[in-house]
């Protein structure tokens, strides 16, 4: 229906028509071929008001008879119906061969060369055809007497409606055309239509250029407006659909791409944060030979090697102090998120890895493996200062630093120095306020979970650590280590008052209390006084019928471990404690002390005992005051019981339980 017409350079609004089109419309008078003028007699004033702008078909291609009629200036007569059909069919065929069909003339603005074409206006001629749906004819707009000037709408849009000069639609028979599909009122979809899907031929753009599409028909769908405005087309006004300023952009796809790009960036940032390899450049020069044709990634700062590159990157970040992952509970920093997740198990109380020997639980398998070395004698790394063995080189290196620095564990609160980190942590707990972990059996509280776990072993009567020399059992490994020193015969700690020597410093400090006159702890039954609270608790067992220490050989029970150890010498037939002044021998050190005081008048001297186990068995009789009866430690004072003693003799009475509870809270 529409086609291009090149108006050229002009100053007035002029419509240029070919001679064939003018002849068909009856606008040519008897003039020469190139000097044709518009003849007013050729108009059809009686038919003009009845014609609509869309009822008349488009002009057909010029034929020889039409040229002859136009040149002679003769009035055109009504052609026969067969000729009309032939002309219209030829016109349809001609229209498909056109490369530049005429369209309505609208001022065009080329965005790329807008400044160069400001002064030159290009117009399009639009001849409405039968592209609209057939329906009742509408009355056309009234044509003014001034001719073509009245048809010019404005200075911006200069066009002439040639439908007023068309023939009656009643005399023409249109060829069958594919009905135009209804516009989809669904949400705006920007992609170009598929001609096979939409049911109309491919459209052509207004001006030739890089964006011009091949065309077979002059029909232009409303949603193929130039792409310049993201607003969807207005379905109520067809005149606004062809305006160049009402195009659209790929809004939905761009938003989808933006969302996808945003999520990709977030995932990339998170991956960088998790991998922690954004600023560490590791090349193949870090690979070293590890034997068996294997290579490991080695750190150049500490020569530590790893099997994977990622572990080396994480290790190097540790040298730089980069720990981006923080614990929300205690604010402790970690290099990897996996380390943080493992640390969070300690706050949750989850320890899935359990030792089968001592039943101690750990959060990591590596900690359990390191702990299992405590149950073995494998210590390949030894300190060259003190000879102490270690299972790992890192432990040895940390231990040797203590020898070199001297002050490595200092409290930031009070400035006290400690030999080990464990002691410093326990001391720092005293500055933190109330305790956190409490025993459900005896209501005793502790600063650390490990202390509570070690304490619970006493209630469970679990003693997994056994001395290989004497068979004595201990609940904790450090107790066994301290006990093993007694078999070596080395006593490094000596009392400055009486000269007595001890293998452990704790035993010497406890012994030093007997030289003071202060005895703050008193028994409310016999009114005896004691230097230590632990000594008073041990004494209270004398007033109770409970005898928790039982001999495995004969089944005899004792109320003190010290007495049980002395009893065990009877089965061995040994009396390790010998008097230096006579030939008397005793199986208990307390009996020897009483013998020397009564027979020889010697109060307290350092005795070389052949039984070093006594120092770990609790306070001995020499540490008690002079008013204490020594019968408590004599073998004759024991109440011997058979193996199958009655339940009344092995259980506490209600009164005794109250007394024990009273002294436990001291």
Swiss-Prot record:
Zinc finger (C2H2-type) boundaries: 297-319, 325-347, 353-375, 381-403, 409-431, 437-459, 465-487, 493-515, 521-543, 549-571, 577-600
Xref: PROSITE patterns: ZINC_FINGER_C2H2_1 (PS00028), ZINC_FINGER_C2H2_2 (PS50157)
Cross-link for Glycyl lysine isopeptide (Lys-Gly) (interchain with G-Cter in SUMO2), residue positions: 110, 113, 379
Signal peptide: none
Region of interest: Disordered: 113-141
A molecular-function term among this protein's GO annotations: DNA binding
Subcellular location: Nucleus
Keywords from the UniProt entry: DNA-binding, Isopeptide bond, Metal-binding, Nucleus, Repeat, Transcription, Transcription regulation, Ubl conjugation, Zinc, Zinc-finger
One annotated Gene Ontology cellular component of this protein: nucleus
Keyword DNA-binding: yes
Pfam families the UniProt entry points to: zf-C2H2 (PF00096), zf-C2H2_6 (PF13912)
Main location (coarse class): nucleus
Family that this chain belongs to: Belongs to the krueppel C2H2-type zinc-finger protein family.
Function as written in the Swiss-Prot or TrEMBL entry: May be involved in transcriptional regulation.
PANTHER family in UniProt: GROWTH FACTOR INDEPENDENT 1 TRANSCRIPTIONAL REPRESSOR, ZINC FINGER PROTEIN
Listed name of the protein: Zinc finger protein 710
Taxonomic lineage of the native organism: Eukaryota, Metazoa, Chordata, Craniata, Vertebrata
């Amino acid at each position: 229906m529409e086609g291009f017409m090149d108006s050229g350079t002009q100053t007035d609004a002029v419509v240029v028509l070919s001679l064939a089109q003018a002849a068909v419309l009856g606008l040519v008078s008897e003039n020469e071929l190139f000097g044709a003028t518009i003849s007013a007699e050729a108009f059809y004033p009686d038919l003009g008001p009845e014609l609509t702008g869309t009822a008349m078909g488009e002009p057909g291609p010029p034929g020889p008879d039409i040229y002859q009629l136009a040149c002679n200036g003769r009035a055109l007569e009504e052609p026969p119906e067969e000729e009309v059909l032939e002309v219209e069919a030829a016109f349809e065929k001609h229209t498909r061969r056109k490369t530049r069909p005429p369209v309505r003339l609208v001022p065009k603005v080329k965005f790329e060369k807008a400044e160069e074409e400001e002064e030159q206006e290009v117009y399009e001629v639009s001849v409405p055809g039968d592209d609209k749906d057939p329906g009742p004819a509408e009355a056309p707009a009234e044509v003014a007497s001034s001719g073509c000037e009245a048809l010019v709408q404005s200075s911006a849009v200069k066009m002439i409606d040639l439908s007023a000069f068309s023939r009656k639609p009643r005399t023409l028979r249109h060829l069958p055309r594919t009905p135009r599909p209804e516009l989809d009122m669904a949400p705006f979809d920007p992609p170009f239509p598929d001609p096979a899907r939409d049911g109309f031929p491919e459209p052509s753009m207004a001006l030739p250029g890089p964006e011009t599409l091949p065309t077979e028909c002059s029909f232009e769908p409303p949603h193929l407006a130039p792409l310049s405005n993201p607003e969807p087309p207005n379905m109520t006004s067809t005149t606004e659909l062809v305006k160049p300023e009402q195009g659209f952009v790929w809004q939905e796809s761009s938003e989808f791409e933006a969302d996808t790009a945003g999520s990709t960036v977030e995932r990339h940032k998170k991956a960088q944060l998790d991998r922690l390899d954004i600023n560490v450049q590791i090349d193949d020069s870090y690979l070293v030979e590890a034997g068996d044709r294997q290579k490991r990634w080695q750190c150049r700062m500490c020569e530590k090697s790893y099997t994977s590159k990622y572990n080396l990157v994480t290790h190097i970040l540790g040298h730089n102090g980069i720990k981006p992952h923080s614990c929300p509970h205690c604010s402790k920093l970690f290099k990897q998120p996996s380390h943080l997740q493992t640390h969070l198990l300690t706050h949750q109380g989850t320890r899935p890895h359990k030792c089968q020997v001592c039943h101690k639980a750990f959060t990591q398998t590596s900690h359990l493996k390191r702990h299992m070395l405590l149950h073995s004698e494998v210590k390949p790394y030894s300190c060259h200062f003190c000879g102490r063995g270690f299972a790992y080189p890192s432990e040895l290196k940390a231990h040797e630093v203590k020898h070199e620095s001297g002050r490595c564990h200092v409290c930031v609160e009070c400035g006290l120095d400690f030999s080990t980190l464990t002691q410093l942590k326990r001391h720092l707990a005293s500055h933190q306020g109330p305790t956190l972990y409490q025993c459900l059996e005896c209501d005793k509280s502790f600063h650390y979970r490990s202390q509570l776990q070690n304490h619970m072993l006493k209630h469970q009567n679990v003693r997994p650590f056994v001395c290989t020399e004497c068979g004595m059992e201990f609940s904790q490994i450090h107790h066994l280590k301290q006990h093993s020193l007694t078999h070596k015969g080395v006593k490094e700690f000596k009392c400055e008052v009486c000269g007595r020597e001890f293998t452990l410093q704790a035993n010497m400090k406890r012994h030093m209390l007997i030289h003071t006159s202060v005895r703050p702890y008193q028994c409310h039954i016999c009114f005896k006084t004691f230097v230590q609270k632990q000594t008073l608790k041990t004494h209270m067992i004398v007033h109770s019928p409970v005898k928790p220490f039982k001999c495995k050989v004969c089944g005899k029970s004792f109320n003190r471990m010290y007495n049980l150890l002395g009893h065990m010498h009877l089965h061995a037939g040994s009396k390790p404690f010998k008097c230096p002044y006579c030939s008397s021998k005793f199986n208990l050190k307390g009996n020897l002390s009483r013998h020397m005081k009564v027979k020889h008048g010697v109060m307290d001297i350092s005795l070389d005992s052949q039984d070093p186990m006594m120092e770990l068995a609790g306070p001995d009789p020499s540490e008690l005051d002079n008013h204490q009866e020594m019968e408590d430690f004599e073998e004759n004072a024991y109440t011997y019981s058979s193996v199958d003693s009655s339940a009344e003799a092995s259980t506490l009475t209600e009164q005794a339980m109250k007394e024990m509870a009273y002294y436990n809270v001291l």
